[in-house]
């Protein structure tokens, strides 16, 4: 499951 930190890092 993707971590929130990595998800925001893509944005």
UniProtKB/Swiss-Prot annotation:
One of its GO terms (biological process) is neuropeptide signaling pathway. Pfam families: Tachykinin. The keyword Cell division does not apply. The modification Pyrrolidone carboxylic acid is found at residue 1. Keywords: Amidation, Amphibian defense peptide, Neuropeptide, Pyrrolidone carboxylic acid, Secreted. Tachykinins are active peptides which excite neurons, evoke behavioral responses, are potent vasodilators and secretagogues, and contract (directly or indirectly) many smooth muscles. This is Substance P-like peptide 1.
